[in-house]
Every structure is written in structure tokens, then in C-alpha cells.
Amino acid sequence: MAVISGSDSVLLSNGSISTSTSNPSPLSPSDGDLPAQHLGPRETPRTKASPNGCLQLNGTVKSSFLPLDNQRTPQTPTQCCHPCPYHHPVSSHSNHQECHPEAGLAASPALASCRMQPHSEYSASLCPNHSPVYQAAHCLQPSPSFCLHHPWPDHFQHQPVRQHLTIIRPSRPFKFPRSYAALLADWPVVVLGMCTLLIVVCALVGVLVPELPDFSDPLLGFEPRGTTIGQRLVTWNNMMRNTGYKATLANYPYKYAEEQARSHRDDRWSDDHHERERREVDWNFQKDSFFCDVPSDGYSRVVFASAGGETLWNLPAIKSMCDVDNSRIRSHPQFSDLCQRTTAVSCCPSWTLGNYIAILNNRSSCQKIVERDVSHTLKLLRTCAKHYQNGTLGPDCWDKAARRKDQLKCTNVPRKCTKYNAVYQILHYLVDKDFMTPKTADYAVPALKYSMLFSPTEKGESMMNIYLDNFENWNSSDGITTVTGIEFGIKHSLFQDYLLMDTVYPAIAIAIVLLIMCVYTKSMFITLMTMFAIISSLIVSYFLYRVVFNFEFFPFMNLTALIILVGIGADDAFVLCDVWNYTKFDKPRAETSEAVSVTLQHAALSMFVTSFTTAAAFYANYVSNITAIRCFGVYAGTAILVNYVLMVTWLPAVIVLHERYLLNIFTCFRKPQPQAYDKSCWAVLCQKCRRVLFAVSEASRIFFEKVLPCIVIKFRYLWLIWFLALTVGGAYIVCVNPKMKLPSLELSEFQVFRSSHPFERYDAEFKKLFMFERVHHGEELHMPITVIWGVSPEDSGDPLNPKSKGELTLDSTFNIASPASQAWILHFCQKLRNQTFFHQTEQQDFTSCFIETFKQWMENQDCDEPALYPCCSHCSFPYKQEVFELCIKKAIMELDRSTGYHLNNKTPGPRFDINDTIRAVVLEFQSTFLFTLAYEKMQQFYKEVDSWISHELSSAPEGLSRGWFVSNLEFYDLQDSLSDGTLIAMGLSVAVAFSVMLLTTWNIIISLYAIVSIAGTIFVTVGSLVLLGWELNVLESVTISVAVGLSVDFAVHYGVAYRLAPDPDREGKVIFSLSRMGSAIAMAALTTFVAGAMMMPSTVLAYTQLGTFMMLVMCVSWAFATFFFQCLCRCLGPQGTCGQIPFPTKLQCSPFSHTLSARPGDRGPSKTHAASAYSVDARGQKSQLEHEFYELQPLASHSCTSSEKTTYEEPHTCSEFFNGQAKNLRMPVPAAYSSELTKSPSSEPGSALLQSCLEQDTVCHFSLNPRCNCRDAYTHLQYGLPEIHCQQMGDSLCHKCASTAGGFVQIQSSVAPLKASHQAAEGLLHPAQHMLPPGMQNSRPRNFFLHSVQHFQAQENLGRTSTHSTDERLPRTAELSPPPSDSRSTESFQRACCHPENNQRRLCKSRDPGDTEGSGGTKSKVSGLPNQTDKEEKQVEPSLLQTDETVNSEHLNHNESNFTFSHLPGEAGCRSCPNSPQSCRSIMRSKCGTEDCQTPNLEANVPAVPTHSDLSGESLLIKTL
């Protein structure tokens, strides 16, 4: 309720008015005009406008920035955002020379959002002499406003006619922005224009200058570079590429060879021999055969399985496979152009089971076979299977020319098993390897699970249209059989198309995130511009990546950065918008530049922490040896940092522009306007939308501010045990069993589509099930041992460009021709053949160790022929150098001519340069190790062979000491690089996260807890991926290393909030961090989760894996940060300076300066000047200390409760003290006490209390620093006659706290007193600024307050005061009753009965105005006696913590004015205590751990009002959120 000047009329929040007659106040204005001093133009004070309800130049009092849910007000307010009709003409001045306290009369809280914005050159003044007209600016909140300059009764009874208002727009000379925030506030369009220009230039340069990326080869870059094996493999490949005719190296001595023969310029020495040979189809046009050729790897093929899980060896299934072949492949219009032909009109038949059964049973086609043919063929296969299995039945047992069995081969094989080679081809190509095993010999019908179909078309790009037209959208089944695997040779080509087509899923994710962001911010403009900033981040980072960093390779994985950036960018936008709205709520009348400065100071730090940790996790991938991973890490990390830069330049300018011009562009989000009831569908829809949003807002507020803290704290031990168990289980899965498996597919079979795709199933499953694939892909092939001399194993290419492999670097010390080298290398070959890992081949080996072959050739030459000398047997080994150099050339040419064995670039032996000088030597042997994809076996092979060769080379002569060994180790090197690189990247990410956390909080304990939480997140996430069947491949390595960057964000936010919490105890800090950051973190997790979920339908594996990972890591990270980390802090969290790193004050981050700056020794009286710096300077000059703390307030002190011990920094004007209207009252404590001391004798109780306050050494409730001690801070505060101005108040209070930033009381509110609340329309005032911003979803603003109004009469009418010590957890409220002798109303006044305690701790108590005092604390009870003067001492309950002290008036003299409390609509769960204490019992309480959680009473007639229990006698100090 509010007070009317001249009478004690009380307006309750439910609309009723309670009045009581009183003596008129001596300060009541006679005409309702503003008294002002008449000053000269040069004497006009040019002070900074007070942002929180200060007196303005035109006599108005800035109304607060408040959305209210005043649904009980019966009338509709007048329209907001118009020129104020109650302004006086510009020329009207008052002759009064004093600044009376009635200078500004507050507007109704329901009308408090009509923001009057002065130009910057007009400054606020306490006693202005002019009234410059303010422009009626747009409304900032969804509640209309009035601009009132008359006393309330006169105004509402006699509303004047709208006067003509002259709008004066003073010229604004150009002034260079004082700061970056001023630049954003004054020139947002310029900032946006510059950013747009930069983005456009980067886009044009990035697209036009370098070549566009090519994704045709998705496997490009998936190879290690820079490792020992990698360098050797690159050098070996360079050797093969540079070996040939007229190349750097050659197998033949060409100068010598040209003298012998000039026919060696064959294609076998061409440059393209270094590429991987690909077997081409050797078309065989034999018309006398049913089939045109033998099926081979070069043909397109399809794998069938039974649709019902039965065997395929039955007549319907066999015919079904033929039907699918005819309907899906052979019927395609392009098939006739692609197929192999025997005649001009017909294509060759496909190799299917049906056609083989037909040829064996003399049927014309597959459709003609019968059941008997199937049985006969099965019997034949059973008879011949053993010959195939023991190797006697081969592919050449049938003589096609003679059309009979080859008489010279397969002598032990029955003739029927060799007919047409059908049995061999069926068992080798068409059926799986388990069909005719000895285990199935006794089965009546062996189970044929899979069957292959070969089509007479070459696989490759030509099959693309057939697949897209007939297979892509087909359900792959005809009811009998199902196509489970396809190999058309178009996997990588199709991947490039799918990579572009599946970008629709990231687009859907972006759209949904946009929708969430739009609902959250209620601004389509901010949403679209945020998304534009995210897309621009990718564009600018692409420019930096390609042009500035000069990266030539752009892997396809870089496209997935968009998905990660959408989630991070949305999170940053939420943080910035939240802090902006916190600032606007806390400083509703702050200049735009100041609001931007405060917002950036806190939001920029928060966004930087999250962006830097995630970017660091990406950049940590640069330590990997795999090219694609390194490039992706650089690009993604750069994109996140660029996004951060745009979020602190682009987005603030967007918000300023939106706040200034575009606030009402969308009608549904527009503030309610007073208009006739609109029954249109759009109006009804908007109204319902607002109601739904409000309901969701309230539900989320209740959950995050009440339910979630209650759940976390009450079950904290259960949560700790549960999440520790999960961590241990995840660590066991990751490290012990089953462990994260390394890749099981070769690089050529690298998975690019989802696992269910038929292309991927063929590579992953069916290649292992058919014998021709097992033999072709190296199963059971021996690993080669290749030893090389003469070339240095150096990779001189660009490791960031997979196409740059460098050039050969020859070893200048190499010398094989010396006798010592000849003898050593021969001995080396002999020793190697004696090793256990050497495999002896049956065939004669001419090339393995060339020195052995050369020595044997020399010994076989007859020296009788003069032409052979000296290359003959007369020479003994080792040979002279000149003999060796000459004879080696003859031996090579003779070997080529006599044996017909042609040497190629892979053949071991000597390598010659263009001068026929031996520059390199290659030896190659077969090992007993078989090729496998198992990492352990390959590691054993490499370690064993490499260690033996290294040991032997240590004794080699100088010319052979630099040899090295290589083999087919590409896949093993990839596995090794992935396993090591992933662990290193994760460790580096954790180290960076710990460093950032430490630098952010300056607390070791919190940082360690955060790292423990991150470790648990990593173990559980990776363990879950292991159980999902993930293998540690390239994509998986990237995603897992990024898990650190994505999971650290939540712990950092909670940790910072824990440090910022003003509560001294752990529980209060945990509740503060949960209520402050809970909803913001949940929204961040939700947006990232949604972005990941939208990836799941994608065909591209990179999208689906990233989506799976993002969903999993968001859920696990949120759970660990919310329950595990917070429970750790609740049980073992630091208190006070525990774990705090001492750091110089000047170098601290500003959010912690208030907690780090004060020391116990800084509380002396010599520091009191710092406290007075917060008072209003008549010259408008604020100290630097005030300015620094002013910007700390929105994050550090959004609420002020009895347990927070936090003050607010913004001073108030005298008029706000004396007129009884508090809009944003912030009163310097020393000033208040100084005023009290000047008027009260030292013998009065108030003075005694004051002296005791200065003597005691306990916590000061007015200090931001919880270590600052000043007990009994709330004492007898009284404001005297209007002549006492703010600057006249002393600064003698609480000298022990004066040095800190917290020497002031702020009676803060975003609400003006109810002047015309009965005019507010029910249902039109929307309470929710956002849908879910933390702490602002409630039906009141965060800094809601109740103020008291008192009419001062005389200084000597002072009531006695006493000190009450109230419990921090169970706050009390007092009920003030006037004496019965009072000639005015004897009605008891009502006091708010709820103390929010950070919106968490609530208890309703009814108290008597009589105070009880005791040494240990006091406890009040309701008393029905109106004239109680005696003080009783009550003992506080043992479980209660005594931290807050309040000074309450014991009695009010009947000559003194009465107190009235303006009960405004407030938070659910709080209501005014009526006269009877029994009424408070309607408010239910439930015990939540150690907290008292209050349940709202929905049946309250008077809206609930949150107040603070710290109440002073004649000047009620009420602190709330």
C-alpha cells in the first residue's frame, strides 16, 4: 500500500483503500508543483543521470523499470509511450529556493515502464532550476506508465487536460565516444555497418581468391604425418613415385641398357605406376560359354539375405534374387549401355545362384529351374566342398577351349566338380564361407545366410544413376529376400552428394534453435541477427583459415563446426540477453552506454570463459598427427573465437538497436496497450500465447529456484555416491573392459555413412564372409619386411596438406660398393633369414636380397669368355668397388633377359641414378606375421622387427648405417596416432580448462572440483560411446577430445556463481548458484541437445555421430555439473578465503574485487572515506570506487537478503528520502547514521546502539565483503527535517567496514509506490520479461521492494528502538500497532511476512511490535497488548543461525506518524500477515534439507509480497530481491 500526502490513506495491493486521518505534513506542497531553485545557466549542475529513480531536470522522478503481474487491479491504465500530459510548460519556474523532499513523486509501479530518456548533455540534479522536456521514449517493459507530477489525490480526482508540449531536440555536437560501451550505445548502426562490411569483404575474398574446397575424396587427410612410420611411408611412396625411366631413381642402369637394347621405354616405368593398381575387367568374349567371364572384384555386386531370417537355399529365394536382378538392375534404361555383351543385342547374364543352377541342369534361365534342380545342385556342392576347402579344386580346373576337365590339373578332383568351374565359382564368389563348412556337413539343408549377385557391369561412377533410381528410396525387399549390402564403387562419390544434401538437418536444427531463442528473448530481430552472426563466424573463420593462415586443405569434417557453433552461439546470446536484462532491472534509468558497459563487463567474461575453453579443446587437436584432425581443430577453434568477437561487437549493437527502435515491431510480444477489448483471433491467440509463456515461466522459476535446490541439497549424499559410482563404472569400461576399440576397417573402407547403409554393411560385414574378398584384401597374407638404404626417411612436404608429400632426400653417406658394405649386407641377409619372424617361401626368390643373387650369378659365370671378364667366377667376394659397380649392371640386364622377370618401381634391389650410380638399395623379405587389423598384433610385429633391424644397423659400416625398415603399416600408424593423439588432446584440454577455471575463480578448491566433475563427465560419456559400439576412428577422436571443451562450460558457470554468492555458508552459496545459473545452463544444454538431435536422421556418419555425441555429452555434463559438482561444493565447498589465491587487488578480475580486496586489517577508521564515496556528490562527481562497484552490482548483487550481507551502490536523492516514495533508494549507511547522531542525544537508545555497533567485531550486514565486521548494523535510522540534505550526512558509521565497497544500504526496488494501481488492467500486465532467464521469470522483478512512508513532525518525537537478532534461515517479520490513544485509526499495520533469502528460504512468522533483547539473540512473538513497553529476552532456537540484525521501532508516539506498508503483487508463496497471527498459518511450509521452503497460498486475498526481515523503527529498511 502507499501513503497519500496529507492523510494516511493506504492502498492495498488488492485494490482496497485504508485511510486514517493524520496531521498534515509540513512538507506537503501547496500547489503540487515542483519547488526548484532558480540558478543561472552556468550554474546548472551537469551531473550524471542517476539510473535508478533520481530526480530529473524537468522535475520528474524516474519511474522504475518493472513488469508487474498485477492482475487484481480493476481498471486499465492509460496508454504508455506518449508525451507526458502532466509536464509543466517549459517556462514555468518556482520561486522556492529550497530543494524540498517532495521534489519527485513516484509513479505507480504499474505505470513505471514509460522510460523518459534525456539526452546525454542534460544531467540529473538534486535541485534543478529548469525543466528540459524529455522525449517520450519507447516502453521497455510490458507494463504501461504514467508521468505524474501532482500529489496523488489531486491527480486522480482532477486529471488535467493534456497540455501542449513543445518537443525540444537540442543539437548534439559530435563527441568522440568515451569508451567502447559508449560507441556501441551511441553508434550501433555504425558498428553493425562496419561488421557487415568486414563480413562481406571476408566472404568475397575467401570465395574468390582461393579455390573452393573439394570433397570428392572424403578420405583425403586421414593419414598420419610426422610420425616415424608416417615419414617412412611417405618416403617409400616418394621412392616408388620417383622410380622409373628418366626419373630420380631407376631399377635399370639405363645408360648401360641403352647400349644393349633400346626397348626398355615401356609403360612399366611410367610415372603413374606409383598409384594403387586397380584391377580392370578383362572382358572375355567367348560365345560358347553361358557366362561371359569369371566374376571378379571389378564387377558391381549385391548381397542378399532372407527377409524372414531363413536359409536362402530354396527355390523361392533363388528365383526372388533373379527377379530383383531383373527389376532393379537389368531393367534400368542405362543398363544396356553399361553391360558386357556377347552379341550386339544381348547382355551377358548375371552371376547368380539361379543361373549357375540353370547351367548345371541344362536350363535356359533362372526362371526355368525347379525344385529338383536345386536339390541336385546342393548334393553336388556337398560332394565337391572338401576339394575346395583343401585347395585342390581351383579356378583353372576346367579347360574352356576343350570344354572339359583339364587333364594336367586337378587330377584328384572328380570331373563333375570341375564342370564349367561352376562349383568353384559358387563356393568362392556366391555363397558365404560358412555355407559348406565341415560343421554343416550333417545338416539336411545347410543354412545359407547370404548370397552374392554379380552384375555384368563395371563398378564405378556409371552405376550412380542405377542406384539413385532403383535402390536409394527402395525398401530393399520384395518380401522373400532383402538386399543387405551393395558394392557399386560409388561410395565416396555418393558421399559428396549426401554431404551437401544432408545439410538440411543442420538447417532444421538451426530453425529449432531459432524458435527456442525467439521464445526466450521475445525478439525475432535479435534471434535472426544472432544466427547471422553465427553464420558469419564460419565465413570469417574460412577467410582466416584459407587466406591468412594459408591452409590449402579443407576437410569435410570442417562442415560439422556449424552444428557446434549453433549451440555455442545460442548460449552466448542467452548469456548476453540475460545480463542485459539483469542490468535493465537493476539500473532501469541508467544511460544506454552505462548499461552496455555493465553488460559487457560481465557477459564478455562469461562468454569468453566458455568460448575460450571450447576453442582451446579444438586447438588442442593440433597436437594430433592426422592432417584432417589438425585442420578441423584450427578451423573450429577459429570459428568459435570469431563468434565470440562478434558476440561482443555485433550482438550488443543489435540489442541497443532493438531497444531503441524495434521493441514493438511484433504485436504478440508488444506491451499491452489500453484499448477496447479485441475479440479478433489474433488478439485471442496473442493473449493465450502470453498466458502460456507466463505459465511456463512460472513453472521454470519455481523449479529452478525452489525445487532443484531442494532436490540437490536434500539428497546430496545420494547424488555423490551415485555419480561417483557412474564415474568408476565409466572408467572401468573405457580403460579395462571392453575398452575403446581402435578402428577395425581399413582406411579404404572408412565409414562415411551410417552403419545401416548397404554400402557400409558391405564393407563392414560382408567382405569378411565371402572367400574372394578375404583373399583379395590381404587376409592371411604375410607382412613384408622392407629395408631401405640411401634415402633419408624425411617428410619434407606440408603436413597440413595431404597432397604435398615433398621430394626425395638422398643420403650422401650411402655406399654399397665398398667391400665392407658388401660383406655386411650379405651377412645381414643371412642373419635375417635365421630369425623367427622370417617366412621362407617355396618359390625361388631372386629379388629379396640382391647381393645373394648377384654373388651366385658371379660364381656361375665362366671366365673363359673374354666378354664376361671381370664379371666371372675368378673374382672373389667381396668384390672391388669398380668390379662391383660394373658387374651389377651386367647381372641386372642378364637377369631381365634370361628370366623374363621385369623390374618395376616396387621390386627390391639396387636403384640407379641417371649416371648409373647406385644411390639406394631395397631389400624385402616375407615375415611370419599375417596382415591383420588388430592393433596389438601389428604393434608386436613392428616393435620386434624394428628393434632387431635397429640393433643390426648399429654395427653397420658408415655407408650402410642409416638404413630403415618399413612395411604395410599405414593402418597401424593411424591406430597408434589416434590412440596417443586423443589422450594428449584430452589432457591438454583438461589442463586449459583447469587454468581458465583457476583464473576465473581464483580458487583452487572450486577449480579442482570442476575438473573432477569434468573427468566424471568424460568417463561416463566415452564409456557410453563404447557401449554404443563406437570405435576410436578419426571422427570419434575429434568428438571425444571436444567433450572436454563442451563439458567444462557448466561447471565454470556454477563455480563462478558459487564464488560470487554473498552467502557465507556453503548451502547459501549453492542455492545462489543454482537459482542464478540453473535456468540459463539448462537452456544452453537444451539448445545444444536439440541441435544434436536434429542430426540423427542424416545419412552421413559425421552428422549422426556428432549428434549422438552432443546429446550425450550435454545430458551427462548437465547432470554432473548440477548434481555432482554442486553437491561437492555443498559438502566440502570452500568458505571465506579457503583455497583462495592471494592476488594484488589492482590485477583482479572485477567480479571478485569486492571479495578479495578487503582484509581484516583494513577496517580501521582511516578507511572511512571510501564509504562516503558512494554518497551523492552535489557537484555530480563520483569516485572511481563507486564506478567500479556500480558495474559489479548486476551479477554480484541482484538480491539483497539478510544472509547476503550485500549492499547496493547507487545513492538516492534527498527528495526520495523525505517524500516517502522509494523508487530505487540506495542510502549510504554512514550518512544515515550521521544524520541520526546529529539529532539524537547520546543517551538515547539509538545512540547507544550505534556506539555498540562500532565496537563489536562481527559481520557487517552492509558490506559486500563478508569478512568485514560490524555488528548491529541496522540501528535507529531516522530522517529529520527537510533542510537536511544528502551531502550533509556524515560518514561515521561502521568504521571497520568503511574501506570496503560495501558500506552502504541499498533499499532497492524496481517498483514505484502505488499511485494508481487501481487503474491497471487485469490480465494486461505481462510479468515475464523472458521465458526462462534465471531469477526473472517470477511475477515480480528481481529487485522488488516494499518501502515505508513517514511524515516527520518533530525531532524530539523519537520512539525507542531495540535490536532484534533474527535467524538467517528463518527470517521474522514484525507487526506494528499504533497506540490505542492515537486519535487516528487504531488499525494494526501489516508487515510482509516472507523473507526471500535468495528466493529460496521462506518462512512466515507473525511478530509483535514489542521487541525483546538478549545477548544471544531475540525472538519476537505476537502480542495483543497495544501499549507494550517492557522488553523481554527470548532465546533463539538452537538450530537457528543468528546473522541478521534489525532495528525495529518498539512503539510509535501518538504524535508521530504511522507506518504503512505498500503491499504490492509479489512472489507466490509470500503474503501479508493480517492482524491475527493465525492468518499466517495458511501459508504452508515444507522442510527441504535445512531449508524452509514455503508453498504459495493461492487463496490469499491480498497479493503476496516479498519483504526482508531487516526492519528499522521509524524508517523501515526492507531488502529483497
Swiss-Prot record:
Residues with glycosylation annotation: N14, N58, N390, N581, N1455
Stored InterPro entries: Dispatched_Hh_regulator, HMGCR/SNAP/NPC1-like_SSD, MMPL_dom, SSD
Effect of D1049A: Loss of function
Compositionally biased spans, kind Polar residues: 1-10, 1355-1364, 1418-1428
GO annotation, biological process: determination of left/right symmetry; diaphragm development; dorsal/ventral pattern formation; embryonic pattern specification; patched ligand maturation; peptide transport
Family of this protein: Belongs to the dispatched family.
Null mutant phenotype: Death at or soon after 9.5 dpc probably due to abnormal embryonic turning and looping of the heart. Embryos also display defects in development of the forebrain and branchial arches.
Chain's gene name: Disp1
Annotated stretches, region: Disordered: 1-55, 1355-1440
Subunit structure: Interacts with SHH; via the cholesterol anchor of the dually lipid-modified SHH (ShhNp).
Location, primary (coarse class): membrane
Residue intervals passing through the bilayer: 189-209, 499-519, 524-544, 548-568, 603-623, 637-657, 717-737, 986-1006, 1008-1028, 1038-1058, 1081-1101, 1109-1129
Name of the protein in question: Protein dispatched homolog 1
Compartments where located: Membrane
Biased composition range(s): Low complexity: 11-35
Originating organism: Mus musculus (Mouse)
Functional summary from the UniProt entry: Functions in hedgehog (Hh) signaling. Regulates the release and extracellular accumulation of cholesterol-modified hedgehog proteins and is hence required for effective production of the Hh signal. Synergizes with SCUBE2 to cause an increase in SHH secretion.
Membrane topology label: Multi-pass membrane protein
GO cellular component: membrane
Impact upon substituting C829F: In icb; loss of function
PROSITE patterns per UniProt: SSD (PS50156)
Record keywords, A-Z: Developmental protein, Glycoprotein, Membrane, Transmembrane, Transmembrane helix
Top-level taxon of origin: Eukaryota
SSD domain sequence ranges: 485-657
Any GO molecular function: molecular carrier activity
